[in-house]
UniProtKB/Swiss-Prot annotation:
Natural source organism: Frankia alni (strain DSM 45986 / CECT 9034 / ACN14a)
Localization in the cell: Cytoplasm
Chain's role: Catalyzes the condensation of pantoate with beta-alanine in an ATP-dependent reaction via a pantoyl-adenylate intermediate.
Protein name as it appears in the record: Pantothenate synthetase 1
One Gene Ontology cellular component: cytosol
Segments forming a coiled coil: none
GO BP annotations listed: pantothenate biosynthetic process
Record carries keyword ATP-binding: yes
Length: 291
């Protein structure tokens, strides 16, 4: 596995791979590597010849009103996991290399930002999308893989790449789960044994709401209440909301034929629930018949 901190070097490496006729994949992570990240690499290896991991755990990006602190991650641990998974190129973006002077360019996505549920303020999300756009520009033509667990981020990245006509395709991969249905996340390690035992209720509640929709429920709040009723005895729900999957627009009705309903019938139920002080997020997709 080749490791580099220089964006010019990783660009040169990937250009050489493409020139040799090989398909390139990119997987991005902020550190805290777990089985969910490795599953992205596994999918990338199925579809491409060369896999590059962009590890952003060392990166601190600043903006006019403050900064986003670097993650406190174990680089050596993550490197070992990715090398064992068969990653070819391991790129560690460094601020001094990427941003030798303050950046004045930021992505604005007002049409989507106004729909975000339970996410950080818009300025933070614009910074995040800008960072991903920067990394895709460095990677060049590629397939890039993100997990569906963070659905809102995934959709924003996909829309950004499409709107800018980047020579990259953002692919969503199914959420990797524990045998009991809990979405794999670094946050799971913060749960007490009792909280971890209760955590499967989140995905079970979302599944129950999806089943209610499949059985004919078309009121979004009523569908959410199916999940909330299961969760309140064991956790503190922050939100459960139904959105149009491709636009993140919150829905009141789930009927595609009704005004304001999902235009293509594709709905995503998004949830954030606190077990103690630890918030867990998850989501599930539902297809509502359009006829």
């Amino acid at each position: 596995m080749i490791t580099t901190e220089k964006h010019a070097e990783v660009r040169e490496l990937l250009d050489a791979e493409r020139a040799a006729g090989r398909r390139v994949a990119m997987v991005g992570t902020s550190g805290g590597t777990h089985a969910g990240h490795i599953s992205l690499v596994e999918q990338a290896k199925k579809e491409c010849d060369v896999v590059a991991v962009f590890w952003n755990g060392a990166l601190k990006l600043e903006w006019a009103s403050g900064g986003v602190q670097a993650y406190n991650r174990d680089l050596a641990h993550d490197q070992a996991l990715f090398e064992a998974a068969g990653v070819d190129i391991f790129y560690i973006p460094m601020r001094d290399d990427l941003y030798q002077r303050p950046s004045n360019t930021f992505m604005a996505m007002p049409g989507m930002l106004r729909h975000l549920t339970g996410m950080p303020e818009g300025e933070h999300m614009e910074l995040l999308v800008t960072m991903v756009a920067t990394l895709l520009n460095i990677a060049g033509p590629c397939l890039t893989f993100f997990g569906e667990k963070d659905w809102q981020q995934l959709v924003m990245f996909q829309r950004m790449a499409e709107d800018l006509h980047l020579p990259s395709r953002v692919i969503g991969c199914p959420t990797r789960r524990e045998p009991d249905g809990v979405a794999i996340s670094s946050r799971n390690t913060k749960l007490s044994p009792e909280q971890r035992a209760a955590a499967p209720a989140l995905y079970a509640a979302l599944t129950a709401a999806a089943d209610a929709i499949a059985a004919g429920e078309r009121d979004a709040r009523a569908a959410a209440e199916v999940a909330l009723a299961r969760l309140r005895p064991v956790a503190d729900p922050d939100y459960i909301v139904a959105v149009e999957a491709a636009t993140l627009r919150p829905l009141d009705t789930l009927d595609p034929a009704a005004e304001g309903g999902p235009s293509d019938g594709e709905v995503r139920l998004l949830a954030s629930v606190r077990f103690g002080t630890t918030p867990l997020v998850d989501n599930i997709g539902v297809t509502v018949p359009t006829a």
